[in-house]
């Protein structure tokens, strides 16, 4: 079977090469095509951080269009440093270098997002249908990335009318419909957008309806049916050099799910579950910014709800979790001879509410955290080949618990990344950060199963993190490559034991290296990534229990995209590989070894010449029907009579038609 897969993949690359040579009677100038020109290798470019140059990940609108991701697993399928667990939408957990995304400062359109509320649910994520760009800044994050950037930052950006409008047009619309096998069912996305007299607007709807999928062995995986109902609305207005943007995002997922969505227990039964998210923000900027006046003012409100109110009469059962997060940011960017300096303040309040339905002796709990911070970050490019990104922030944090006990403290964070460019082809860099995290509450959903005597330890203290990275980048006009060494350490995280909330005594650490390479030849793009990470708690490897820190071992991806302009076609394929994981600590904790797996996805896209505004696409995920579970899923275990992972989908075909007017 391994030989067959290798043969098929090799054939794919060979066919792509042949197609390239046959289809290119006329050479093109790639510099005229923004999506195929590689950026110069440098950590600072035009006063902005180049995330990819320091081992991070950037997905552009063109990248997302190629992938047409139905979920976040497919969104990050070409990134070996990012692992997404399986299951239905609300169960997917995103880990970067083995660390769940709650350990990073996550934002959508600049708005901070809440952390994962419960250890049996997924990460809070944005609908990929709305995205135009994703930046994953792993490790030492900039001071203006936001509060609590322990292991870096993730920035999601959604589309607006100006992104989708054709040149010279003032109105447009887009309709995308698809049908998928293996339970994927129907998916539909509709968008309308326009521009008139300085006012631009967009309204986008996306919904999915399907059934539980089956794994590679043909077993139905309960609680995995697609059930998204999402809305994105945006409006912007420009006048006299001013611009105001207003955005609203609404996300709903209501279906029968497993109680513990990240693991399979004997005798599992589905129960109704609804997960909801609403986000509103308003932002002010200048379109005629000067070197000394380039302001940004933003205010936001987020609400996250989790309803599980029809389960059995146990403390492990019914609960409602509600979170309200609101705050803002005021900053200005100054342009000087060698770069830019951004300075400002940000603030936020996070309210938590839990309802246990009276199945223990403390039904309701209310508690909150507050934060106020000041920050500055400079990004400089010097004539002697050096570039520098450095900054600092100082934050005040306050935590008021469910017993009205109040904790408060303040602390400083610093970061710096220095690079030297020997020539146009080689650059070396090194960076470090020390981050003060304030009071970290983490998976606060634990309190739903705690009684009235549960309290906060008087010594509960803020968390802290350290990051180190170093590497070298190579590149030319049509190729790039790089290696990044990383070491992230996080301490002072919460521990919800049976009696109290306190600090986890362990320091969690992820260290290793990443490799990346990309080559562009005429209409062909080939890329590869490799990640090797060792994730530990204290001196011991972390357990594969779908927690905030997970063992990922060795992971790699290989991908190709091929344009065939003579036939208005695009084809591509992605291979994802994960190595076997076996360690004594996991075995002693009754976990089985995690086998290696190889998964191949592929797609073909065609624009009929007679209907230029229509695109037909067919994609296949898990081409060889591999029976596997993603590296950050709960690994199989002998505990509780036997725990199964949430297996990934088997072979799935998706047929899509898109119209743009």
UniProtKB/Swiss-Prot annotation:
Residue intervals of the TBDR beta-barrel domain: 170-661
Molecular-function GO terms, alphabetical: siderophore uptake transmembrane transporter activity
CDD domains, per the entry: ligand_gated_channel
Compartment(s) of residence: Cell outer membrane
Annotated source species: Brucella suis biovar 1 (strain 1330)
Function of the molecule: Heme transporter.
Signal peptide coordinates: 1-23
Induction / repression: Induced in absence of iron.
Cross-referenced Pfam families: Plug, TonB_dep_Rec_b-barrel
GO CC annotations on file: cell outer membrane
Record's keyword terms, sorted: Cell outer membrane, Membrane, Receptor, Signal, TonB box, Transmembrane, Transmembrane beta strand, Transport
Similarity remark: Belongs to the TonB-dependent receptor family.
PANTHER family from the UniProt entry: HEME_HEMOPEXIN UTILIZATION PROTEIN C (PTHR30069:SF41), TONB-DEPENDENT OUTER MEMBRANE RECEPTOR (PTHR30069)
Entries under SUPFAM superfamilies matching the protein: Porins (SSF56935)
Membrane topology: Multi-pass membrane protein
Positions of the TBDR plug domain: 48-159
Name under which the protein is recorded: Heme transporter BhuA
Name of the coding gene: bhuA
